[in-house]
């Protein structure tokens, strides 16, 4: 059986005294898309941010438990968070390209690593934009501002920016919720094409999106992981009443 690429063990996250995640344990597998679903405030985005150690930036956040990646707990003192975030990249709900050219957006992480060779940078830009399914749309205007792109194009440039650092895992926090249906469909197609090379965790409020793109789905409610398993099986035959009620739209 395939070994998990990421193991979350007994993870709890607190914002001050408020417990946002309750002893969650969940494994993620290589070259799969996992959807995290649940109503607002259920803990799904909190889990994503814990995997990327974004809580480090907030003194109110306390994390207990462990997240094992490459055989090591990412919350150990030895973890280099800069290197971690290169291997576990993140794409946010609102497209957030930097106020610079499309080219410079994509190579931003490489420049931080000290890469200066133009050939290497050029190759990374093309490869990453191809991977994000936007190369043909922007190849003739790489030195135009990314801010001038449509929302869907901006989001795909943000995906390309993550791809350029050669991550193993990509975290996506509601990456299509701010986009129109056509742009959202292009993002879904892009993600589906990327799973041959990457492991992806996608927070989504769309049951249809989860059913279309993901291999596995985790349902969160009030900080608890209620159910986790094969997406088709969960949607056809949920094991918990809360899961069925959420999937069928009785609450959420």
From Swiss-Prot:
<dbReference type="InterPro" id="IPR003593">
    <property type="entry name" value="AAA+_ATPase"/>
</dbReference>
<dbReference type="InterPro" id="IPR005670">
    <property type="entry name" value="PstB-like"/>
</dbReference>
<feature type="binding site">
    <location>
        <begin position="38"/>
        <end position="45"/>
    </location>
    <ligand>
        <name>ATP</name>
    </ligand>
</feature>
<dbReference type="InterPro" id="IPR003439">
    <property type="entry name" value="ABC_transporter-like_ATP-bd"/>
</dbReference>
<feature type="domain" description="ABC transporter">
    <location>
        <begin position="6"/>
        <end position="247"/>
    </location>
</feature>
<protein>
    <recommendedName>
        <fullName>Phosphate import ATP-binding protein PstB 1</fullName>
        <ecNumber>7.3.2.1</ecNumber>
    </recommendedName>
</protein>
<keyword id="KW-0472">Membrane</keyword>
<dbReference type="GO" id="GO:0035435">
    <property type="term" value="P:phosphate ion transmembrane transport"/>
</dbReference>
<dbReference type="GO" id="GO:0016887">
    <property type="term" value="F:ATP hydrolysis activity"/>
</dbReference>
<dbReference type="InterPro" id="IPR017871">
    <property type="entry name" value="ABC_transporter-like_CS"/>
</dbReference>
<keyword id="KW-0547">Nucleotide-binding</keyword>
<dbReference type="GO" id="GO:0015415">
    <property type="term" value="F:ATPase-coupled phosphate ion transmembrane transporter activity"/>
</dbReference>
<keyword id="KW-0067">ATP-binding</keyword>
<keyword id="KW-1003">Cell membrane</keyword>
<comment type="function">
    <text>Part of the ABC transporter complex PstSACB involved in phosphate import. Responsible for energy coupling to the transport system.</text>
</comment>
<comment type="similarity">
    <text>Belongs to the ABC transporter superfamily. Phosphate importer (TC 3.A.1.7) family.</text>
</comment>
<dbReference type="InterPro" id="IPR027417">
    <property type="entry name" value="P-loop_NTPase"/>
</dbReference>
<comment type="subunit">
    <text>The complex is composed of two ATP-binding proteins (PstB), two transmembrane proteins (PstC and PstA) and a solute-binding protein (PstS).</text>
</comment>
<keyword id="KW-0813">Transport</keyword>
<dbReference type="Pfam" id="PF00005">
    <property type="entry name" value="ABC_tran"/>
</dbReference>
<dbReference type="GO" id="GO:0005524">
    <property type="term" value="F:ATP binding"/>
</dbReference>
<dbReference type="GO" id="GO:0005886">
    <property type="term" value="C:plasma membrane"/>
</dbReference>
<keyword id="KW-0592">Phosphate transport</keyword>
<keyword id="KW-1278">Translocase</keyword>
